Amino acid sequence: MKSVRLMHALCRRVQHTFLARRRDVEQRRHYAEKCDSVIKGVVVGVYAKEGDRQPKMTPSGEKFDDRVQGKITDLIRETGLSGQLGKGRVFMNVDAEFRAVAVVGVGQEGAGFNDLEMIDEGMENARVAAGVGARALQLQCCTDVFVESMEYAEQAAEGSALAVWRYNTNKRRRDRTLISKLELYDSPDSDAWMRGLFKAESQNLARRLADTPANQMTPTIFAQSTVDALCPCGVSVEVRSMDWIESKSLISFLMVAKGSCEPPIILEIAYCGTAPEDKPILLLGKGITFNSGGLCLRPKDCLSMYRGCMSGAAACVGFIRAAAGLSLPLNITALLPLCEIMPSGMAAKPGDVVSLLNGKTLGFVDVSKAGVMAMADPLLYAQTIYKPRMVVDNSNFVYKQFEKAGALTGDRVWRLPLWRYFKELIMPNDTFDSSNRGRGPASSCIAAVVLHELVPCVDWAHLDIRNVGMLTRYNPLPYLLKDRMTGRPTRTIVQFLFQMACPDGK
């Protein structure tokens, strides 16, 4: 009996010891999450070698190299770094303050505007190099990443902030990727750096909204997220429910939305940066939070990506937040129709016809192409109520401004034709005035032609961002993640609004 008691006592002691060791292991396993230590890293640039000349460090890179007694130059020579754009190495324990140093190629020194590519290569090279370096240091668990300007502080901020961002919401806290804190290194141009962070954070906001799973980003949740993001910035957000939509007779939008149990919502957003009586720039963003294709269901393999059909609305939220943060001196009004497209007994059927606010009829011939239907009546309503000076949903002036903005931000635009030829491609019918379907594959041009018929004589631009604001699958930019939502073209529109507000660039 005594031996049995001793055995039980021994088992309890072993069990307690095991549990204590297990707790100790768990504490060690989670120690990194609880640790408050700061790990610093720095990104410096190196220009590509030309001919027999060896790679040359940027001015800030040379200062840092002098600080560490030429160690960086020696390491560049030993590792064979060529300064090729986006190629680099991370060196550890070179400096007492910075645990890791990322040396990244910035491409050719003195790169400027490329007329053939329609892009400012110097600015884009800074984005790429800063983004590659910041992400490399993020993978080394650097909590604070210092990035040199590479002669373009604003663009370096954009590239690094876009590169280190992650959509982590649905991962366990201990498994989430560290989002490094970014600081400008060795440059007095802090204003440009902050502008770049504002623009990148606005695009990251659009990326988060678009990348969130559809069940976590319904029209109602999107509306609440918009209120949370914009109202603290002094932006007015009005949330319009089904009753309001019906009272305004926005029938084309309701036809698209009625197949889902999720109630549709329209957001009216107003940013006032100048005199209230000044006419606003009107923005419309398609906010289909999930597009199943309705009765014409899309293939199952690609259904998930169609949560990104609200990328236009997400970009609108992002660049209005940036406009407020940058205090742009102009008035902006945005209308965001939010809904889901689902198959059900209430869903729109091929061949349905609606009467628009202008008295014309529009046939819903192809239910898988619902964007035109969702935007038609809201576009007519917004023009009537707000009487804008410009509608961004084609004048030469507007395109030239977008072309310039795209060249400066690295997110370029390409003007598509708006010829009468495409109007003739719209399927003719004796029973309605127009339709959302046309002959041939030029669906972007056909959609623009249909919407163009609804716009009176004001400056107008239709941005088709299909497969641009959604998943990045082919040749992604180095500072964006593959197979994730891009948030494009948020920064281009922010730059466009800046050009409209400040024509002299000040």
Predicted regions and their residues:
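Glycine-/small-residue-enriched capping loops at alpha/beta junctions
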Residues: 2-278, 480, 487, 502-505
